[in-house]
Regions:
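Positively charged, low-complexity intrinsically disordered leader regions
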Residues: 1-56, 60
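Active-site cofactor/substrate anionic-group-binding motifs, chiefly glycine-
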Residues: 42-43, 47-95
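Glycine-rich phosphate/diphosphate-binding loop of Rossmann-like nucleotide-binding domains
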Residues: 48-60, 142-220
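Short, structured coil segments at secondary-structure junctions
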Residues: 65, 95, 115-117, 172, ...
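Anion-binding alpha/beta catalytic cores of soluble intermediary-metabolism enzymes, centered on
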Residues: 90, 97-168, 260
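Rossmann-like adenosine-cofactor binding region
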Residues: 195-273
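Adenosine-phosphate binding glycine-rich loop
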Residues: 255-256, 261-304
């Protein structure tokens, strides 16, 4: 693994290795701390949009591994005043051992990675959220054991979370269903990847059909527009029936796990009652962002 830009960068063996290392690092941290695997290493934490979990978990993770993490808002860099991306990449690659970047366009991230000359990690783009999906898979494995054969259902907007969860779930040997309105389908290349897995992947616009007998149901914010705007009102109409409610989840397995990458808009993609009922696994999922990201850093920078 040279970078982590999207889930399809990983082989099934690499995915399993990341989860295994994350388990080890989590156990060590609970016992008092991990070895300084990143001693002398520097990590740029570059953010072009707001973040709570990604920023703080990377800051804490780099510190726990003995490295130095520097947060930077791209609006405060010369890149925010028009300096070409390729110049920023070539400069930061000479200062830092690794760059984490949360930005908008996946194409910008991939161009940056080609030029930086150091490992680059996707902290979220409009196309992919690999760190979050690694945390999801770690959480499922912790609570349910083997991932292979389990039914994973995503309900919501077929954007970054859906794209990454589909690929990650299939790489892990899961049966994956994506439930979304027709006009909010996942990326075309993700669907091409998924259809290679045949009956292990299913795409539907019917939430009740998709959730049937699911072991795990995941969702994410789908009303990403500014409240009160025409786009927001349109999304509220388009996603009627896609809220995770107790009634909808009746068709899933009785012990279904519910995951949410956060932040959650209660009353939109998930009801308050369902969120609170499944808060233990949702906040385990949030904690595991720290551990999987430490694993990725340890593999990329310390040969773990």
């Amino acid at each position: 693994m040279k970078n982590l830009l999207k889930m399809s960068d990983l082989s099934p063996a690499e995915l399993t290795h990341i989860l295994d290392v994350a388990d080890q690092l989590k156990a060590q941290q609970k016992l008092g701390g991990t070895a300084p695997l990143l001693a002398g290493k520097t990590v740029a934490l570059m953010f072009s949009k707001a973040s709570t979990r990604t920023r703080t978990s990377f800051e804490v993770g780099v510190y726990q591994l003995g490295g130095l993490g520097n947060y930077m808002n791209t609006a405060e860099l010369q890149a925010g005043r028009g300096e070409p991306l390729k110049d920023t990449a070539r400069v930061l690659g000479r200062y830092y051992d690794c760059v984490v970047w949360r930005t908008y366009r996946q194409s910008d991230l991939e161009e940056f990675a080609e030029l930086a000359g150091v490992p680059v990690i996707n902290g979220l783009t409009d196309y992919a959220h690999p760190c979050q999906v690694l945390a999801d898979l770690m959480t499922i494995r912790e609570r349910r054991g083997n991932l292979a054969g389990r039914k994973l259902c995503f309900v919501g907007d077929g954007s970054s979370m859906a794209n990454s969860l589909i690929v990650g779930g299939l790489l892990a040997g899961m049966q994956v269903t994506c439930v979304c309105p027709q006009s909010y389908r996942p990326a075309a290349d993700v669907l091409m990847f998924a259809h290679k897995y045949g009956s292990a992947f299913h795409l539907t616009a019917d939430p009740a059909e998709g959730i049937q007998d699911a072991d795990v149901v995941a969702t994410a914010v789908w009303n990403t527009a500014q409240p009160g705007t025409p786009e927001s009102e349109q999304r509220l109409r388009d996603f009627v029936g896609y809220q995770l409610t107790g009634k909808l989840l009746e068709s899933a397995k009785p012990d279904v796990m519910v995951l949410h990458c956060l932040p959650a808009h209660r009353g939109e993609e998930i009801s308050s009652a369902v969120f609170e009922q499944h808060a233990p696994e949702i906040f385990d999922e949030a904690e595991n962002r720290l551990h999987v990201q430490k694993a990725v850093l340890a593999i990329l920078l310390a040969g773990k």
